[in-house]
Amino acid sequence: MDVGTMGSRAELLAISIQFGGLWVFRDLLQMNPLFEQDHVFCTFNHPNMGLVLISFAKVDGHILAAYALSKLGPDTFSICYPFSSKLDAFAQTLDLEWQIASMHKEAAACVYEFLCVESVCLHTGENWRESVIEPEYASYIFDTINVFQSSSLTRELYSLGEPNGVREFVVDAIFDIKVDNSWWEDPSNSYWKTVIGSREMFEDSRKKTSSPSPSFASSKDAGTIPAIQKKKSLLIEMMETESTYVERLRHLVNDYALPLRDLAKSSKKLLGLYELNTLFPPCLNKLIQLNSAFLDEFEAIMSDLNFEDIDEKKFEEIDLRLACCFESHFFAFSQHYPRYLEQSNDFGNVLKMASKIPKFVEFHDQVKLNANMNVGLSQLIMEPVQRIPRYSLFLDQIILLTQEGECQHTYVRSVEIIKNIAEMPTVDAEERSRIFAGLQHIIPDLAPNMISNSRNFIDCIDVTREFLKNGQLHLIPYTLILFNDRICLVQRRSKSSIASTILDLRKQNPRNSYSKEKRAQYIGSNMNEAVELTRSMVEENTIFLISKYASSPSFFNEYPILKFRCDFENVRTMDRFYQSFQKALSMNKSQPSCLSFSKLNDFVVFFNNYSRFEYEKESKRSDIVCICTNDANVDKHKFLQDGNIVITFFQQDEDFHLSFDSWLGVSLPTEAVIAKEDLREACLNYLINIKRLLLCPFSNRNFSSLDLYSNLIQHLLSANSSPRKSRLSFGGRPGSPSKISLSLNRFYNQGGLSKSCATLPSQMYNLDHNNISQKSLKFNTHNTSKASAEKTVEHLEAFKGGFKYHTDLKNLLYPLSEKEKIEGDELYDNILKETFNEELLSHYPPNIIYATFQKYLSSFINRKFGVLLSSSFIQQLNTVENLNLSFNSTDAVYHLKKILQDLPESSLKILENIFSIASDLLLRLPLKDQCDFVTKQLAIALAPSMFGSNAVELVYYLAYHSDRIFGTVEELPTPVSPANSNNDKQLDESKFQAIAMKEMPERHPKEILPGQIEREAYEDLRRKYHLTLARLAQMTRLNEDSKKSIPLLYDRFNHDLKLIKQSVQASLIRKQCELDTAKWTLEEYESKLNAKEGCQTNIFI
């Protein structure tokens, strides 16, 4: 599958019914303002799914459009309005007494459809036990439905249902080896580097100070055996002191920090929580984790070193590995050590105060005695502060003993990082204190826990929130403040900007006081990992802040989806804020060895690059994972988790093979092949489209964390004071959403599948599409009278004659005037009164006939017979492998004819007449746009709206090949042997001539007077002339389409030919090797034979 196809598919999924549902309602509202007035809601509380909300409304007076929202995700579907009669038949058959009003009956129909995986079908008589829902379950559901109307809830849903877009996001990239400097300099990784981009953007995260970069020159003895021995001793000493350092840090946490925290929570507390947080900063545990990982790798590399025999070449390899190890781990240190070093300035005051507490002194002495380490608390808490300069001392000596080259340069970069760490706290402390002091003046009620030495200010932006209150829309000014770990929301006192004031705090000292216009009220904050920050796909200046979990802080729990607007003048500022947010998420990972970014058009993709070993230890994983490997047997399934998509790039020969894996019920290509030169663009396009797919607010993912939907529904209903009552106990049939919700914890490590978009594993081997369609036909055949079907066929044949009466159809699609609309209504009424015939149509122009024909299809036929091209019919087509309707292929006609035989005879006859009319219209319409418009309207009338372009393609194919499709089923063509081909051809020609002679009417020469032509002959000639022009137009269109499709086929053919050529070349090489081996064996055999004959001759002589 090519990238363009993937892009269109992903964009379609991102706004399709299953993933963005409410766009259907918004479009319907624009077409029909009465839609909002008829909008009704119903709720019930399911024991497994929790609270379920369903909204529905009538469309065109005969179709119910419904949208359901539950923990399983969103679902949108349409129901033919006579569905209520099915409910009555079901209730009568099962002796269920339902006292349901009209509105409740419609709600029951929507709930019934929602609880069934397949399209609802009912059975009467003895087979009622095969019904898709159990009688007791249905009875309890329909008895507990609560129906109500709410215009404010309708508007709230419309505002939330909009799909979202993203231009910046984070991806985890996994490689076979560590992504260090040697990896970046390896030319064999050039194609991977084009994908993950540049790492220069993150150099500012190391926060270079004003001090010059260190420069070193190797000593004269560098590289000699004495220098190598001395260097080994330094490395051993450094490793031993690192082990002691890690042991002391663990002693500090286990024997001091944890016991004192436990005592602080009881009545025996020795120090308060504030003092404990000062002495034992939150980043202390992170330092232990980082240094333990550094020590493990340090020891692993040193274990390969032979201390007795000095192999200079092997030592150089180990030395380079050590240098790269130091650089990568010291870079990780630079993210966390500065916070500890900065807070160390307050250690002395707290220890001085604690030394005056006798019980604390007693506790300290007892711990020091039990530990038998002879190290006090004051020394332990200063260990990280003293350790950083010691790294620098060790490395200074190691660099002098290292020869100039890549290894020495890597050591120099490591020293540079360490010295920057030592100088960071002074710079950070001044800026941080200035910013937080200013924030406390601007936001007087700022939460105390927001001020922390481990928190860095990153960016802020002024926005406006749309808020619905008492049915009126209010605009409230807000400001979003972004820190490295949290996002803060404040409400401004006025419309004046405060973002510029906050940003200026980085460079200038805060004022003692600010005016009222420059102040704000603190609303709340949330963790960056707990929210999604995305932009609208429709309005460029709209921001969505979506809370992922119901355990969010109170404000974000009450409003899980916040919609903000930004001034168009600040769109660039908004882009910068998006990038800052994604960069903060990327920098907050614990294990990546390298950070990089790549741009494509307006999109920025941040890559966290790992080795496989590093990623197994990563706790904060992204929802998109790329595995870049040369190993065809890589175990990609261990990287799968709930809610993510894994893309594997496997390099083979001159191409890259892509495969996609996910537990989500989304449609993804199974495999793709990309040439090396197209790798970057293709890869980034795949990532962008997949991220769009995942970022819809109502995307059905994270099924093990089902808080968002419950949180959202509770908010929507409680905000409008909607009454709720329900009781439900039975579990429903095996395929119902209740069973799906139960099975969420049984499959795929608590991963699940959505009702709309996937099939349960337990059902994968029990699908029989033909059986489903046949079951649904039993009800249709039972309830649809044969007489009404025959009458409908007569009406359609009359329409066909009416269209043929008019020779010029260029005005067919002209809009109707008011007078013509009245005439069209009268014509439609005559159809319903059964006073309709072909002669009646001859008095109307083509545009009135066509408008009446469309109304007849969408209103009368749909109400009488339902959707003729049902969802099960289209799904059956989708299950046929290699079925391509874009070409006039015999197998496509065969499969279509075979599946059509499952339809009822009446429906088949109706479809045959409809597509006969469509075929005639498409052949006679002069313009391609007119043909496309007619095809789309037929697709809307005959197929469910959820299938979109697929339904249009199907209708187009059925119309142009109606004469071949609507007939008896033909077997697929079988290969014919050359011996019989000529005989079969002669038989076919003779048979065709016999049939033609038999069907040819007798023609008697008719005398025609000179200069006179009969009107019938003239009309027949005129009709044939226009028919010929239409066929020429059709052939022109097919020629244009072939010009587009043939290059794709040509490229695919060249690719296949290339593979065949490679295979043939490989086969020739193997055969040549076999031939050479045979020749060599023969020569050896002949030489032995000659030697043997020579021996015998000598013996004889």
UniProtKB/Swiss-Prot annotation:
Residues where Phosphoserine is found: 736, 977
Localization per record: Cytoplasm, Cytoskeleton, Microtubule organizing center, Spindle pole body
Recorded GO CC terms: cell division site; cytoplasm; cytosol; medial cortical node; mitotic actomyosin contractile ring; mitotic actomyosin contractile ring, intermediate layer; mitotic spindle pole body
Stored InterPro entries: DBL_dom_sf, DH_dom, FYVE_RhoGEF_PH, GDS_CDC24_CS, Gef2/Nod1_dom
Any single Pfam family the record assigns to this protein: RhoGEF
UniProt entry keywords in alphabetical sequence: Cell cycle, Cell division, Cytoplasm, Cytoskeleton, Guanine-nucleotide releasing factor, Phosphoprotein, Septation
Signal peptide: none
GO biological-process terms attached to the record: division septum assembly; intracellular signal transduction; mitotic cytokinesis, division site positioning
Compositionally biased tracts (Low complexity): 210-219
Residue span, DH domain: 230-428
GO molecular function: guanyl-nucleotide exchange factor activity
Region called Disordered, residue ranges: 203-222
Function: Has a role in the control of cell polarity and cytokinesis. Involved in bipolar growth and septum formation.
Protein name: Rho guanine nucleotide exchange factor gef2
Lineage per the UniProt record: Eukaryota, Fungi, Dikarya, Ascomycota, Taphrinomycotina
